[in-house]
Amino acid sequence: MSHQTKENVLFISGIDTNVGKTVATGMIAKALAKAGKKVITQKMIQTGCEHVSEDIEAHRQIQGIPFTDEDTRGLTCPYIFTYPCSPHMAAAKDGRRIDLDTITQSTRRLRETYEYVLLEGAGGLMVPNDMESCLLYTSPSPRDRTRSR
């Protein structure tokens, strides 16, 4: 059964790092699940860790559930970088590039399975994604997912 609508992706953001986005995302997911909704959380880009998104791990702990199949396949966090800084700098330090289509496709696949996707941003709304755009992700649509700086 497909649940794909523009309205089923909720973007969780804050004004900076360490302002409570991760806890808020986990708590909202837990409340939606308790209300009988099929929900998953997603972190577009995680910096400062290796192999596993620490924020996705925190979401699952708050929700009281184990890692999902989507977590192990990387759909819930398409980009993990080791250096703890803004996504564009962390990608450069790791010698990698952030492809916005990869993030969009991951979100689209989650939308097809879940009633709600809670999409946690990295840092604040205007955190640079690369040298030309930021990840102001206002819609799952590829047309309007970025905003030029």
Question: Could you describe each region identified by the protein language model?
Answer:
Residues S13-G14:
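Residues at the beta-strand->loop junction immediately N-terminal to the Walker
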Residues Y137-R149:
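Single conserved hydrophobic/aromatic residue that forms the stacking wall/gate
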Residues N18, I45, A122-G123:
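Anionic group-transfer/hydrolysis microenvironments
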Residues M1-L10:
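Extreme N-terminal, non-catalytic leader segments
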Residues P87-P128:
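Phosphate-binding/switch loop-helix module in NTP-utilizing enzymes
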Residues G26-G95:
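N-terminal phosphate/diphosphate-binding loop that engages ATP/GTP or pyrophosphate donors
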Residues K21:
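Conserved lysine of the Walker
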Residues D130-L136:
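Charged helix-capping and loop-helix junction motifs
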